[in-house]
Amino acid sequence: MPTPQHPPFDPDASLEELAGVGKNRRFDEIIDDEEFEDIQVICKRGEEVIPLAKPSRAFYFGDRNLYDQEAKRFDQEEKARILNTDQFPRNLARFDELKRSCQRGFVIPFVGAGMSKSAGCPEWREYLLNLCDDANLDRDVMRVRLEENSDYEGVMHDLVTALGVNRFNLDFERDFKTPDDIEGAVTLLPKLFDSSVITTNFDRVLEKVYENDATSFVEKVTGRGQAGAFFRAIPAGDRYLLKLHGNLDNAAERVLNKAEYDAAYGNDGNIHFDFPLPKLLKRLFTSYSFLFLGCSLSADRTIQTFMRVAQLEGQENLPHHYALLACPTDAAKKAAIDQRLADAHITPLWYPEGEHGYVEQMLGLLLD
């Protein structure tokens, strides 16, 4: 079966390509870049430098052993740079473990709002804060609730109550209209995960990305809908999208305001596993490895559910879960996140705060 590591045979490939030319794409691009001076392949006649159309090919066919050595060295240095191993030394072993799981098809991506932002949609926190003026709510107070208390559920409830559901829905559909040209890390997902995907997002970025890649989802299900089909799709390798919190235009299956969160998770401050979403998440979390992408993993009901599952089941009985996360510069905040993730049996791969381009680069490493 073709995979990113073992692509399908190309009957139109040249002899050079069949021989292995092009297998080190990033290394070849560096060698062929005239402005990159660390590695140069040159041809000289006396003191005159004769330009080469493809220095990488000259290197490859000129000294295959040296080419392979330098390509391997480049890959190792590039991997260390992307994983920021100087700052986060545990990233290397964690990444290698994650990559093995991805190659074996054991990982399901769990996609949050950050991935839609990389595609051109508004950032979720700033979007909510920008609604405060229209809702006559104190923006500074709401910012504290979001940044200090991670009270997205409560802020959302107050905004929807003040604006009215119909107005909120209409504005959301316009503000989060899927861009025609989607770029960023999210575009790599169809190549990495050609099967089932989970998201808490209301937008339709994932649907568009998979459609653009000619790998459209066979079906979409929601967390409060008929989610049983999603479990059958995973072992079958069918391409299903689980929109955990539903679609914005379907109030019966949506999880948006406090009343809907209570109906989905329970309303007394506890996680109830006889309620739809905790029951669904428990079954998934105990059966498959997740890779959290674009998720803040703040102390909301979803992460609380995972923490409760880990407590009830015992971490030794759970598959490994992973997250690509920006590392807070504040030591106390990082310690709090570390503890929350440990309690939920989620292993972070950190990158520097604010430098979200590393997510795309890490996903690129998984493809190599």
How would you label these PLM feature ranges?
Residues 108-111, 199, 292-293:
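Short hydrophobic beta-strand that contains or immediately precedes a catalytic carboxylate
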Residues 208-212, 252-259, 302-306:
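A short secondary-structure junction signal
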Residues 1-105, 117, 159, 163-165, ...:
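SIR2/sirtuin-family catalytic core signature
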Residues 103-154, 209-225:
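Adenosine ribonucleotide-centric catalytic and binding domains
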Residues 83, 90-92, 97-103, 107, ...:
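Metabolite-binding pocket within alpha/beta catalytic cores that recognizes anionic/polar moieties
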Residues 114-117, 203-205, 247-250, 296-298, ...:
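Short, solvent-exposed loop/turn segments at secondary-structure junctions
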Residues 216-285:
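Active-site gating loop/helix substructures
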Residues 57-69, 135-160, 234-253:
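Short, compositionally biased "basic patch" segments
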